[in-house]
């Protein structure tokens, strides 16, 4: 079967416009990496925000990374922490590590070694105590 990226993109857009968070998450990647479309971080952020607001943990983590680096949005460490926390609370290990790093570095939150360790332990599957 031959892949038809244009057809797939059409259907992802249709599903994304109808509010499908998984399709919106995929569209975020498509636009971030320019897979069959012009690469556009602003458009990636738009799709990830749509999915993140519906509770999609992967999109929340991706949106956090965009805020952390200032790609497609104004750099905002506080917003990065907010979105990583949402993903981390759903068990996303990468988000837990990144949230721990933010506490370690005091970026977007007050520096707090104990809070950083709590998130690192969660990411490692250990007790958060």
Feature names for model-found ranges:
Residues 46, 82, 123-127:
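Alpha-helical tetratricopeptide repeat
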Residues 1, 26-33, 62-69, 73, ...:
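Hydrophobic face of amphipathic alpha-helices that form TPR/SEL1-like repeat modules
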Residues 4, 12, 17-20, 33-35, ...:
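Short helix-capping/linker turns of helical repeat alpha-solenoids
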């Amino acid at each position: 079967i031959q892949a038809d990226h244009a057809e797939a993109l059409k259907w992802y857009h249709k599903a994304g416009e109808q509010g499908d968070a998984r399709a919106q998450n995929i569209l975020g990647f498509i636009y971030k990496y320019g897979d069959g479309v012009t690469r556009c971080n602003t458009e990636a952020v738009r799709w990830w925000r749509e999915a993140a607001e519906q509770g999609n943990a992967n999109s929340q983590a991706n949106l956090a990374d965009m805020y952390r680096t200032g790609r497609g949005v104004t750099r905002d460490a506080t917003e990065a922490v907010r979105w990583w926390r949402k993903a981390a609370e759903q068990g996303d290990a990468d988000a837990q590590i990144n949230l721990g790093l933010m506490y370690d570095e005091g970026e977007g939150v007050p520096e707090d070694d104990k809070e950083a360790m709590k998130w690192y332990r969660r990411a490692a599957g250990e007790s958060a105590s």
